[in-house]
Amino acid sequence: MSDTSLDSMRDLRAASCGPVGSPEVTTDLSENVILTSLDDLHNWARLSSLWPLLYGTACCFIEFAALIGSRFDFDRFGLVPRSSPRQADLLIVAGTVTMKMAPALVRLYEQMPEPKYVIAMGACTITGGMFSADSTTAVRGVDKLIPVDLYLPGCPPRPEAIFDAVIKLRKKVGDEAIAERGKLEQTHRYSTVEHRMTAVDPIVDGRYLRAETQQKALAAAEAVSPLNLAPAEQPETIPAKS
């Protein structure tokens, strides 16, 4: 295209734009400018720099500690562990939560600035795990205390599973919108920690010892046992002379 044609196109554009004229954008600037929305820019900055607060109370936290090493290198996801809840936007709960620790966990969550996210890591965190049957102090799920964005099951989850959870959380952060964030807030955020215990019959009640097959096994064991000896005769005691 000749220079005359370019000049005529610029004159036509300037005439159609009115007295303000057409914006003059150089070629170098047009090739180095990225057009995006405020939501995409804000979400991209947050999902690339998640600062987790590590709340480890049991063995699940050992698997998360493995991510700090060079074998997995979780720094490539932009994760920067923080020791203060006021500087964190991601709370990772790993391990059993007891009734006594529940107020401290809720206090840490409330001190985190918005927007904030929670990952429940491990079976004990999600449902109480092996303590959910007869424990009087274990919380049956951390979601009874604080809202959970992502559940990570396992006993314990492997480091690769933790990476998968972080990737899924990044996708959730990337799809958020500033205008709709207020609609996503939960009305009833916390539930009570006073769990109603259900009385059940004891598991070990001795009935298996009274079974016929068990009685035969015990009798056979007593017959061949080398410890099945006659009781030793008690030595005769001679009263002392006065």
Swiss-Prot record:
GO terms for molecular function: 4 iron, 4 sulfur cluster binding; iron ion binding; NADH dehydrogenase (ubiquinone) activity; quinone binding. The keyword Chloroplast does not apply. Coiled coil: none annotated. Binds 1 [4Fe-4S] cluster. NDH-1 shuttles electrons from an unknown electron donor, via FMN and iron-sulfur (Fe-S) centers, to quinones in the respiratory and/or the photosynthetic chain. The immediate electron acceptor for the enzyme in this species is believed to be plastoquinone. Couples the redox reaction to proton translocation, and thus conserves the redox energy in a proton gradient. Cyanobacterial NDH-1 also plays a role in inorganic carbon-concentration. Keywords: 4Fe-4S, Iron, Iron-sulfur, Membrane, Metal-binding, NAD, NADP, Plastoquinone, Quinone, Thylakoid, Translocase, Transport. Its main location: membrane. GO terms for cellular component: plasma membrane-derived thylakoid membrane; respiratory chain complex I. [4Fe-4S] cluster binds at C59, C60, C124, C155. This is NAD(P)H-quinone oxidoreductase subunit K. NDH-1 can be composed of about 15 different subunits; different subcomplexes with different compositions have been identified which probably have different functions. Belongs to the complex I 20 kDa subunit family. One of its GO terms (biological process) is photosynthesis, light reaction. It catalyses: a plastoquinone + NADH + (n+1) H(+)(in) = a plastoquinol + NAD(+) + n H(+)(out); a plastoquinone + NADPH + (n+1) H(+)(in) = a plastoquinol + NADP(+) + n H(+)(out). It is a peripheral membrane protein. InterPro entries: NADH_UbQ_OxRdtase-like_20kDa, NADH_UQ_OxRdtase_20Kd_su. It is found in: Cellular thylakoid membrane. The keyword 4Fe-4S applies. Its EC number is 7.1.1.-. Its cofactor is [4Fe-4S] cluster.
